């Protein structure tokens, strides 16, 4: 088995999908989890205005709507959380995503004050954060807020990780990578677009250039610029297609060096890092 085949198998990626079937699969997955643990009353997700959180948010609300109708339990809710750092450049996209999702509840937590306070405390301890590390601080503060909300609403934190993101480890460890449940896991980027199109999402929300937008020095830096490879290339690779040799090397290098991000904390029983 080639490394490409191993990666595809590990991430559960498929060369082709039926959008309606995958929508149903994700909704049923979320419903099944909540039914298994009836003490859970909410799904909590940060909404950025990008493709992934828009899709995950819509699926969450659909799952909650169905579960309420089936059980008569009106305490179930989907909580969409806006988490800007100061003023967000693409705020209108966030509002458009909220309008599309129609969440039960919308909370806004501006993380800038918390991030600056943490940065100042570290500075006083003799640690000056780089712009890159400050970006990770933002991602972790966003997740911290979501877990606080989930803790107060008997909820679970929903993630947006998918195969095209997992393969490169393009997420912050214990930031956006630290969630309870991931309904998009297995899909690549173009497949996520297919689901949103099937759901009637406004095109500009999934045709915009994806960006983590964490760095102050490089605002709205496109993911593809940071990765050095396009999502089309990544999706082709995940679909088992032949890609240029350098593209394959770039993708595989990202995969191998970020393996620790896709695993629980390393113990004495692990040896993947020795290979």
Swiss-Prot record:
GO biological process: NAD biosynthetic process
Positions that bind Mg(2+): 52, 165
EC numbers for this chain: 6.3.1.5
Described purpose of this protein according to its UniProt entry: Catalyzes the ATP-dependent amidation of deamido-NAD to form NAD. Uses ammonia as a nitrogen source.
SUPFAM superfamilies, per the entry: Adenine nucleotide alpha hydrolases-like (SSF52402)
GO cellular component: cytoplasm
InterPro entries the UniProt entry points to: NAD/GMP_synthase (IPR022310), NAD_synthase (IPR003694), NH(3)-dep_NAD(+)_synth (IPR022926), Rossmann-like_a/b/a_fold (IPR014729)
HAMAP family: NadE_ammonia_dep
Binding residues for deamido-NAD(+): 140, 173, 180, 260-261
Binding-site residues for ATP, renumbered to this chain: 46-53, 160, 189, 211
Keywords assigned: ATP-binding, Ligase, Magnesium, Metal-binding, NAD, Nucleotide-binding
Domain of life assignment: Bacteria
Subunit structure: Homodimer.
Provenance organism: Escherichia fergusonii (strain ATCC 35469 / DSM 13698 / CCUG 18766 / IAM 14443 / JCM 21226 / LMG 7866 / NBRC 102419 / NCTC 12128 / CDC 0568-73)
Gene this chain is encoded by: nadE
Family, per entry: Belongs to the NAD synthetase family.
This protein's pathway: Cofactor biosynthesis; NAD(+) biosynthesis; NAD(+) from deamido-NAD(+) (ammonia route): step 1/1
CDD domains named in the record: NAD_synthase (cd00553)
Catalytic reaction(s) noted: deamido-NAD(+) + NH4(+) + ATP = AMP + diphosphate + NAD(+) + H(+)
Protein name: NH(3)-dependent NAD(+) synthetase
A molecular-function term among this protein's GO annotations: ATP binding
């Amino acid at each position: 088995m080639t490394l490409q085949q191993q990666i595809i198998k590990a991430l559960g990626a498929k060369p082709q999908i039926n959008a309606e079937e995958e929508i149903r699969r994700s909704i049923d997955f979320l419903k099944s989890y909540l039914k298994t643990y009836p003490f859970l009353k909410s799904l909590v997700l940060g909404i950025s205005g990008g493709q992934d959180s828009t899709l995950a948010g819509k699926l969450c609300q659909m799952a909650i709507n169905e579960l309420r109708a089936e059980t008569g339990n009106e305490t179930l809710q989907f909580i969409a959380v806006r988490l800007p750092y100061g003023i967000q450049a693409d705020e209108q996209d966030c509002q458009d995503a909220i309008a599309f999702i129609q969440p039960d509840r919308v909370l806004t937590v501006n993380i800038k004050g918390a991030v600056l306070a943490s940065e100042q405390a570290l500075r006083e301890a003799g640690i000056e954060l780089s712009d890159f590390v400050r970006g990770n601080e933002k991602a972790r503060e966003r997740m911290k807020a979501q877990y606080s909300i989930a803790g107060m609403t008997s909820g679970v934190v929903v993630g947006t990780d998918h195969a095209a993101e997992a393969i490169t480890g393009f997420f912050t460890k214990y930031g956006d990578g630290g969630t309870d449940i991931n309904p998009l896991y297995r899909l690549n980027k173009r497949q996520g677009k297919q689901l949103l199109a099937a759901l009637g999402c406004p095109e500009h929300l999934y045709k915009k250039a994806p960006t983590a937008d964490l760095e102050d020095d490089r605002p709205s830096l496109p993911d593809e610029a940071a990765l050095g490879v396009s999502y089309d290339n990544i999706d082709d690779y995940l679909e088992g297609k032949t890609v240029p040799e350098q593209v394959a090397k770039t993708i595989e290098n990202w995969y191998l060096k970020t393996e620790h991000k896709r695993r629980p904390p390393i113990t004495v029983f692990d040896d993947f890092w020795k290979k």
